[in-house]
């Protein structure tokens, strides 16, 4: 049984992330594991905090969530860990062989600091499974009706095609394949066209609806977000890192920009070796 791990800090943003995770779990017949991480070093805490009372309060809140979402999906449970937020959530995902991690990007109790500035991509880059990040304060429909799949000239850009197709099949989504022409060189432009054609063939094989478009792009984060706004997207799928080429603008900082600034949920996929499309 596939499982979704959700980072919980009891903020509204983490509850919003939980709602999105439950929608996916229900559609895909998956289970949900909520994870709360106690990141406080009590020996250095200037306030008198009783860790036992703190853990009791957390367990009580989880019990309320279990009651609220009872029967909403295949199964829902919770895990309490001690340590660094990002590393513990990733460890739980590995231990449970999770399908994905879902987190809100501007929560409290550790997430807010964690997601700020240059640290925005840490949980995404540390995870071995896809990470769905959902920015707080934006009202995005949870059903994945329209998914944006941006493709550039790098080989690894295609590795997000299978998980996109799988999610699309659960929701009967329409995938918008966005060919990002970042160079005027004909060989690079041809390569992107070939990658888009491969994605089209894959989606045809999997009976996934799709639309293909090409745009000339100098700033792929802004251009992708502009396109997502235009089609009223529910999800953008990106890679966490890519090869370094003269045409590649989607380096780590750009993935971080997307995660931190996208008003749309972003699924970040870590490249793997020896994948066959």
What do the predicted segments below correspond to?
Residues 50, 67-101, 205-236, 241-250, ...:
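Structural beta-alpha unit
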Residues 116-119, 191-196, 250-255:
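Charged helix-capping and loop-helix junction motifs
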Residues 37, 106, 136-138, 180, ...:
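Short, ordered loop/turn segments at secondary-structure junctions
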Residues 102-105, 130-136, 266-270:
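Short beta-strand elements of ligand-binding domains
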Residues 1, 97-99, 120, 129, ...:
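Local beta-strand N-terminus motif with an aromatic residue
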Residues 101-128:
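Helix-enriched interaction subdomains in cytosolic or periplasmic regions
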Residues 1-52, 146-213, 233-235, 261, ...:
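Small/aliphatic-rich secondary-structure junction motif
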């Amino acid at each position: 049984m596939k499982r979704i791990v959700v980072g919980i800090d009891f903020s509204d943003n983490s509850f919003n992330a939980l709602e999105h995770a439950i929608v996916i779990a229900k559609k895909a017949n998956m289970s949900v594991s909520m994870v709360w991480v106690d990141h406080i070093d009590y020996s250095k805490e200037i306030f008198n905090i009783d860790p036992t009372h703190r853990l009791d309060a957390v367990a009580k809140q989880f019990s309320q969530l279990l009651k609220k979402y009872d029967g909403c999906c295949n199964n829902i449970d919770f895990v309490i860990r001690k340590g660094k937020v990002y590393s513990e959530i990733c460890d739980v995902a590995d231990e449970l062989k999770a399908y994905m991690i879902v987190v809100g990007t501007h929560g409290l109790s550790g997430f807010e600091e964690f997601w700020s500035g240059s640290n925005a991509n840490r949980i995404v880059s540390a995870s071995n499974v896809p990470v769905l990040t959902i920015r707080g304060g934006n009202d995005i429909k949870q059903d994945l009706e329209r998914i944006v799949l941006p493709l550039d000239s790098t080989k690894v850009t295609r590795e997000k095609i299978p998980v996109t197709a799988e999610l699309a099949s659960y929701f009967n989504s329409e995938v918008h394949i966005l060919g990002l022409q970042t160079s005027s060189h004909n060989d690079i432009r041809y390569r992107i066209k070939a990658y888009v054609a491969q994605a089209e063939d894959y989606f045809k094989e999997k009976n996934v609806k799709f639309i293909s478009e090409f745009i000339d792009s100098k700033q792929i984060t802004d251009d992708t977000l502009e396109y997502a706004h235009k089609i009223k997207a529910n999800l953008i799928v990106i890679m966490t890192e890519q090869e370094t080429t003269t045409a590649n603008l989607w380096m780590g900082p750009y993935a971080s920009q997307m995660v931190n600034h996208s008003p749309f949920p972003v699924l970040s996929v870590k490249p793997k070796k020896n994948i066959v499309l």
